[in-house]
């Protein structure tokens, strides 16, 4: 039996071993299809990262599909039922690295746009694609750089669907209409090294820091709101000492992370953390890394169109959530764009034997096409 257009393209993309930041020719496949539809293509290569910006039309509004061609490493090959870069269909599921995150979505986007343009060759507004090979990596030379380039020439995105795997049990059951912000602090508490038998001749930074860390962990940073849970504080990494049992460490390194709502700013978080550390009399340095600001699309044409499209396909409205980690949507939201995430079920992403239900790819294609119908048809 011949594969459907979306399944065939998904297989082609999965077969390319595009472990971040490699693209391995995935974008060339997409560009070839988009050129045939009349898209203007602009390649944007920054160091080891391959990106492209594609646009069809010059009018407003500018609607964009955003996504990434890179994937995480396959992990232990012995644990895969089938080779991760040899797309395989088993019992109605397409298996392979990137099937759900997010080569399946990319295939759905392309086929949806092909079908939409076939029906609406003179559609309203403009359609764009923003594709990167640096979403699973350090996100330095990917979407953020493309956004900077577009903003510098005042080419602003109005509405954007990011194809991240937003769904939980069935495709379209969840639409992410925002994401929490993320900021990490790398704290170094300074003390004086010494022998454990002579603590009066040393200054143990671990002992000094623990009460402050306990206070930070116990703090209620905010109460959240209708769209976001309360801000969370977590400590993922601690390091002190030489490994010897008789040496008091001279330094204590602590890494902590905040996932924060729109009730807080990153500057307010910094101020409150420094206030606690200062109150405990610590000698310290903190290096801050802001991964992304929170964003929210709570109203607007895009959200209404996506919800309507999902409801038309599933006969049930999606839940609107802001849970989970960060995504490239945070960079696009900086343009003032309406941003939502809609993609496959995320149960197997970043795992061995990653897979996506083939029927879900067909449904997702319909959802994308119906969204275009509502907005630009």
From Swiss-Prot:
This is Succinyl-diaminopimelate desuccinylase. Binds 2 Zn(2+) ion per subunit. GO terms for biological process: diaminopimelate biosynthetic process; lysine biosynthetic process via diaminopimelate. One of its GO terms (cellular component) is cytosol. InterPro entries: ArgE/DapE_CS, Bact_exopeptidase_dim_dom, DapE_proteobac, Peptidase_M20, Peptidase_M20_dimer, Peptidase_M20A. It comes from Vibrio cholerae serotype O1 (strain ATCC 39315 / El Tor Inaba N16961). The active site is at 70, 135 (proton acceptor). Zn(2+) 1 binds at residues 68, 101, 164. It catalyses: N-succinyl-(2S,6S)-2,6-diaminopimelate + H2O = (2S,6S)-2,6-diaminopimelate + succinate. Belongs to the peptidase M20A family. DapE subfamily. Signal peptide: none annotated. Zn(2+) 2 binds at residues 101, 136, 350. HAMAP family: DapE.
